[in-house]
């Protein structure tokens, strides 16, 4: 499995059977020209995870692709044919097994309303993309896409998340608003070990 980070929370996941794009949002780049996608997976409704116009253009350029998202976000794309509303606990066959986990966005602050948030476990635990949550799966994970910044997250929580999930490796994501993402990734590495 090859995973390419396209900025912020956007990942291109490629296997010998499938090409999946996760969270093509407004803080990501390089996804507009992608072709031969099998599915576009969105974790939740926030624009840094789903650029509505960009996703519509992407689907027009990838007519065989399925858009997978939660019910709330799905309402914005109800006019499209290839939309699949997913729910936690489901297992999808998108050419590769994708387990839908999670359920709720991590709390942001005070009375800021929450929203649905799906986490996606691709393959047999090869990659977990939690969206804006710190969802701990019930089985081993090879590569964890770990958020390192956001109004809902402290770096200490990211460290605890890595230590709890215990992936073989991790990929820092959700860094699009940082001025020096490498600094935060370095601090995460220092606290979690090699």
Please describe what each predicted stretch is.
Residues 31-32, 51-53, 77-80, 139-140, ...:
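Short glycine-/acidic-enriched loop or helix-start segments at secondary-structure transitions
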Residues 26-69, 142-145:
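Active-site metal-binding motif and surrounding structural segment of the metallo-beta-lactamase
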Residues 55-106, 186-189:
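Portal/gating segments that form or line small-molecule/metal binding sites
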Residues 18, 61-66, 165-169, 193:
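A short helix->loop->beta-strand "cap" motif at the edges of active sites that frequently abuts
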Residues 4, 41, 68, 84, ...:
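Hydrophobic/aromatic beta-strand patches that form the interior of the parallel beta-sheet core
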Residues 134-194:
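Cap/insert and terminal regions of metallo-dependent hydrolase folds
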Residues 26-27, 45-47, 72-73, 87-91, ...:
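Short, acidic/turn-prone active-site loops that include or flank metal/cofactor-
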Residues 1-35, 85-140, 152-157:
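Core dinuclear metal-dependent hydrolase active-site scaffold
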